[in-house]
Every structure is written in C-alpha cells, then in structure tokens.
Amino acid sequence: MAAGIRGRRLSAPLKPRPIASDAERFGYFKAGKMGLGWLVECDNAAQAETLRAAYPTYATLVPAYLSPYKGVYSSTFVRLPFPVFKEDWEAIESGLKQAGIQVPDKVRNMGHEAIRRAHERFLLSKLPNFGADAGGGYATGFLRDGYAPLPFQGVAIEYTRKMGYRGIIGDDMGLGKTMSGICVLFNASQGRKLIVTKNSLTPSFYARLKEWTGKTESEMAVAVSATGKARKGPGKHPGAHPEWLGLKKYNVPFDADIDRYEVLIVHYAILKKWLPRLLEWKPEAVVFDEAHTLCNPDSLLTQSARRLSEQVDSVVAMTGTPGSNRPRELFHLFDLVFPYRFGDFHHYGLRFCDAHLVKQPRTVFNKETGQRETKQVEVMDYDGASNLKELFYRLRATGMVRRLKNDVMAQIPFEDIPMVLPVSDEYWAQEEECVRKVQEARSKGETESLLSKLLLLAAEEKIKWASEWIPDFLENRNGPLVVFFHHNSVGDALREFARGKGIKTMCLYGNHKDDDFEHRFQTDEGVELALVSYAIGRDGLTLTRSAHMLLLEYSWVPGWIDQAKDRLRRYGQERLISYYCPYLEGTTDERVVECVVKKKDVLSAVMDNRSDTVLPHFGSM
C-alpha cells in the first residue's frame, strides 16, 4: 500500500500496481467505523477471501465505499484489528501465513507493543487503590480498647483478606507492618497462629502482642532451642524451670508441651529444628516477618519456610524491602506465598531478569592429568532486570501491597551529607597492590576474597578519620550518634577508641550485643554512641532518640542501607534526620557507592514504579 494512506477516500480511481514486497501490503488504518488496525492489501479477491476465512472472528473485507483505491481493489483489502491478547496475535499471524503473506518485522513489533499496552491497561484496572480507606470488612474486636489500625494499615489488612489471607505486605520501613500483620493473623484464624521473625525481634513482637491484644503467658510463648533436660554440674537438677535454664518466663523450651498455646513466636535460626514440631502443632495462619530473609531458594531456612507455608491456609510475608538486591529475589518471595503464581523461575528470569548465557571461569578436575584446571563454561545469568513496569503491575495486582512513607504520612525531612575524605599515600599504595592481585586472580575466579580486602582497606582508612570526627561531632551536636558498618573489626576499633575517650557506648554487632539494646538506647540519655552492624541491626529496631547516623561502610545490597537508615526515620521522629556519608574519592569505596545507587534505581522501578534520578554522591541512596 502506498505510504501516507490513512483511510482517506480518493477522488479518482487508480490503476492496478504490482506489490513489490510484503511490507507494502500493510497500512495503518483509523477511520470512522473501521476503528484501529491494519489494512492488508491482497494480490486478488481469492487471497483476500482466504485470509478472511482463516479467522472470521478477526478479519473483515473492506467495503467498496471505504477502499483506499476506489473502484479498483474494492474486495482485495482485509481489515485486521490490533491484537489485545497474545493468542489473538498468533491467530492473525497464522492466517496471514496461510494466505501466503509474511508478516514484516515492523508489523510484528507493533503487534507485540499493542499486546503489551493492552495487558498493562488490564493490570492497571486490577490495581487496588492503596490510598483509600478500606472500610470495615475486617474485625478488630481482638484488640484492646485504645488500639486500632490506622486507615492505611486497614487497606493492607482488607486487601490481604480479599486475597484469601495470603499476601505480601511490603510497606516502607517504619509504617507499622507489625500492626497490619497481627490484625491479618487474628482475622485469618480463630485457632493456632505462628509468627516467624528474627531472633532480635522476638521480644518486641511478644511485647506488642501483649500490649495490643492482652494475651497472657498461658496463651502465647516464644520458642527457643534449649531443652528442659537436666544439665551436668553442681546445683543442676531435673525438671528444670525456665528461670533455672536462664530463659525468660515467656520462653518455651524445645521439648515442652506447646499444644496449650494459641500464639507461638519462632525465630529463623531455629525454624529448621522446630519444623517437625510446628507441623504437628498445625497452625492455621503464619506471618513471616522480615521475609526478605527467605529469598535464597537453596537455603535450608527457605526450604523449611516453604514446607510450612504449604501446610497452612493463611500465609502473610512482611518486609520493607521485598527486593533487597535484584528482581530475581522477588520470584522466590512470591513463590513462598503464592506457589506457582509466576510459573517456573526460568521463564520468569527470561521475562523480568534479562536472563542470558554468559561465560564464567570454573575450576574442574581433569582425570587425565590428575590436576585441577580453570575452564570457561556457559551458565545462565539471572542477575539483570527487564520489563520492570510490567513486573510492577503484576506484583501489585496479584498479591502485594506497598506504600512509601510519603504516600501515607507527613514527610519526615532528611538529608544525605556526602563527605569527601583525604586519602593517604599509604592507602593508595595498598589499593594499587590489591587491585593488581584482583586482576591476576580474575581469570581464576578467585576475586571475592581480594575484593573484600579492598573494602576492608577503605574501612580502616576511614576509621582514622572517624576517630577525630566523632568526638567533635558529639561535642557540638544534640543527641546521640548511630554508626553503621559492615566488618566487625571496624566495630572493635571504634569500641576501643570510644572507651579510651570515655564516650558511653552501646554495641550491637558480632559478639558484642548489649542486652535490651533498643529500650536502653531510647531511654538512657547518657548513651552518646551506638555501634551497629548491618548484619544484626539493620531491621526491626526503633532508634528515634537519635537524628544523626554515620554510614561508615556501605553494603553491596541497597536494601540493607535503606533498612539501616529507617532505624531513625520512623513514627515518633520529629526532627530533621542527617545521614553522614563519608567516602574516599577516586577509590574502590566510591565505586561501591556508584554500584549501589544503580542497583537501587532498578529496584525503585520495580517496587514503586519510579526510577530515581541518580544524583552525584549519594543523592538517591
């Protein structure tokens, strides 16, 4: 068909012309009752009839009075609509093939784009309105007087209820997912209920349940790995009481009778050990708190959680960072709550993880030579990201509710303060030597330990600066300072330094875990410094007595940094929060930050349908 024809009627008939290629057969048509679609020019009336008869549901012959070539080809044009579903497009393409017409790439691409847009509109129509009040479809009678979920929390409860009490509550950190999870738990079941969380958060969950629902020690307990059997040694006797075992009164040993409890709280470290007992106990509803812990399908922990979720009617996962690192993690979290909702992982990876074959070095044993050799082998790489908007819609429409702080509450102001640190000649020499070793080891696939050494070198260099900056900061600022880091050796160095300066310090890292850390930090005005590692203290804690945080090291996982920062940016915080972000310019330390910012931009597109502008120096961290 001639270019430029858009369904207009010609004033005079044109003579027949030869069709040079299949690409000339297709014209974009939009006019009156004809609607939107392709107008396909056929060689003759017989071919047009063959095309129309191949699928009468879709194809129509163009009436003579609407033919672009008036009076010439009145019956050799066939109108095909833009497809809405993949099956429609396959039927249209099959019919064209039967008529001897090949579909040009341009037409095929436009067809696929039409399908994508139609699918996006369909998903958008199913997207729940998370900003509206949910109404009164759920019960709150189990809560004590004076306690009730906020309207936006009610939306999450109602949405999960409509999904059959299965769902992912992915609200931003600090938005009260604990209240939402407890309400879903008690709405879903009148019988036994299970909460699985991190060890450091079990006392907090127990306290909230007791405060909000009025449950007593006879109705709920926290599971521990210890047993009630007698121990060897003087003064030890059988029939031990929990107090004798060094346990709190609400703890229940592994070999205790748990049938009398309505609510049981188990932490992830002992889930595998407790799994047989929990399956016998037969809970009717389970909440997985901090569910991003369950994103590794090969771990025994995730496999135990999967076995448990398959035996329970109601399963709710709660996490402020549903995708801590890459889109591939979302599949395993969704598959835990909604088995097979996304099909198999490989097809998910092809669609949303930009899966492709890459060559990687692998050490293999050569039987002929009796030695180990390094070979390049092809493996499937699922670490990428693709079709993020479609993934966002599918997540929201099929089981996940997520709101950011700015969506549901007055914005808590905060600022990222980048701090460029001087780099010593000694550090430059050490980094140069380490980089050289990394390049040599790259072909052998042995770079991981050397990269860790590079990061530790940067951390040690920043400790020298921190030992001068922290005392000046505490002297001139109001309120305590929270320091986050990755390596335990960094915490040890800061702890010894603070002790020498007489700075009252609390620790939560490695082997240094102060009892009742959160409560003491929030109430003891004498505490000036808190040393916290990402591994232990990045989630669940409320540290709103401080409005200042020093991110001395950066995690490879952007979700960990967000979790750490949200220890201060929570309900109850009324001051401007300052995050101090020191980095060694031009070094590996700065390149780590660039990598983390790019990762976070991808995750923002998936989880929140937005792509943050990557600002220089921590603008979107």
Where are these regions (language model features)?
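Walker A/P-loop
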Residues: 164-184
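Conserved P-loop NTPase motor "coupling/switch" region that bridges the ATPase
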Residues: 190-193, 211-217, 221-252, 260, ...
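A conserved SF2-helicase RecA2
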Residues: 556-621
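Conserved helicase ATPase core of P-loop NTP-dependent helicases/translocases
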Residues: 252, 480-484, 492-495, 499-537
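SF2 helicase motor core recognition
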Residues: 178, 271-276, 323-327, 490-495, ...
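Charged, low-complexity
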Residues: 5-6, 10-17, 27, 38-42, ...
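Conserved helicase/translocase motor-coupling segment
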Residues: 406-504
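Conserved Walker A/P-loop ATP-binding site and its immediately adjacent core
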Residues: 180, 191-211, 324-329, 486-488
